[in-house]
UniProtKB/Swiss-Prot annotation:
It comes from Borrelia turicatae (strain 91E135). One of its GO terms (cellular component) is cytoplasm. Belongs to the EF-Ts family. The keyword Cytoplasm applies. The gene is tsf. Residues 79-82 are annotated as: Involved in Mg(2+) ion dislocation from EF-Tu. Pfam families: EF_TS. Keywords: Cytoplasm, Elongation factor, Protein biosynthesis. GO terms for molecular function: translation elongation factor activity. Associates with the EF-Tu.GDP complex and induces the exchange of GDP to GTP. It remains bound to the aminoacyl-tRNA.EF-Tu.GTP complex up to the GTP hydrolysis stage on the ribosome. It comes from the Bacteria. Its main location: cytoplasm. This is Elongation factor Ts.
Length: 278
């Protein structure tokens, strides 16, 4: 049976598959349109499985927030061109919305199949790398942020506010948004110095001490220098101790205290997440 170019184009328009693959699928099922769509899915999943071993170092971060939850999702792919593809972006936005609304932090079988179908259509190794879903309490204010046109960085920050009547306060909401921007810019690893593993602190202290051994300085002087270096380093990776993004004369902790005093309610960061491509 001869397959016309019009039939191939119709199948291509519906499925997004390549012209050659559409022709092969139609030939294989004798021109039956519905069977050809099924055949393409089978072909696509097989080819997607073959591509799954290839490096996927590019990608895009997606985020969604509603009244109950906030989420971040990283979908990886092979090229930044695909990360800008409209089908890729639409799929990612839809998937993170589904995950947040369901409260699930893992994919179901249907979603896994949809990932494979997308990979088959785009012809790259595409997979979900990370998912973060966090519940939002009634006294918590959340802001999320995606950086740049390619959304290679995504963050959310969650503030606990003692007086829920202040949740709509402009200065509070501005603070929350600024803190989201801050997390995107400085990528803190911990909320506070107290959250940092004691073994890590000990390793850093030993490293700084070793660096100073050949300095010829006295033990007391070395101890003081090491203490200063350690304090500086820990402050650089702990969010509350970092210089505030819009006023580095204040730490993040001091900026929160400033706004807290101005609106007469206690504010504290209870959660944040930073997610990036690569």
């Amino acid at each position: 049976m001869s397959i016309s170019p019009q039939e191939v184009k119709k199948l291509r328009d519906v499925t997004g598959a390549g012209f050659g693959d559409c022709k092969k699928a139609l030939d294989a099922v004798g021109g039956d349109f519905e069977l050809a769509k099924k055949k393409l899915r089978e072909m696509g999943i097989a080819s997607a499985d073959k591509r799954s071993g290839r490096d996927a170092k590019e990608g895009r971060v997606f985020s969604y927030v509603n009244k109950e939850r906030v989420g971040l999702l990283l979908i990886s792919c092979e090229t930044d061109f695909v990360a800008m593809n409209s089908d890729f972006v639409t799929f990612g936005n839809s998937l993170i919305k589904q995950l947040v609304e369901s409260g699930k932090d893992s994919l179901d079988k249907q979603q896994e199949l949809e990932i494979k179908n997308l990979a088959a259509t785009i012809k790259e190794n595409i997979h979900v790398s990370k998912i973060y879903i966090s519940n939002i309490a009634s006294n918590e204010l959340v802001k999320n942020y995606l950086h740049g046109e390619q959304s290679k960085i995504g963050v959310f920050i969650k503030l606990k506010v003692d007086d829920v009547l202040k949740m709509e306060d402009e200065s509070l909401n501005n603070l929350a948004m600024d803190l989201a921007l801050h997390v995107a810019a400085f990528a803190p690893l911990y909320l506070s110095v107290g959250d940092i593993c004691s073994n890590y602190i000990k390793e850093q202290e030993e490293m700084f001490t070793k660096q100073m051994e050949a300095s010829g300085k006295s033990e007391a002087v070395i101890k003081g220098i090491v203490s200063g270096k350690l304090k500086k380093h820990l402050g650089e990776i702990a969010l509350l101790e970092q210089g505030f993004v819009k006023d580095d004369k204040l730490t993040v902790k001091e900026k929160i205290e400033e706004i807290s005093k101005s609106i007469l309610t206690k504010i504290e960061i209870v959660d944040f997440k930073y997610l990036s491509v690569g």
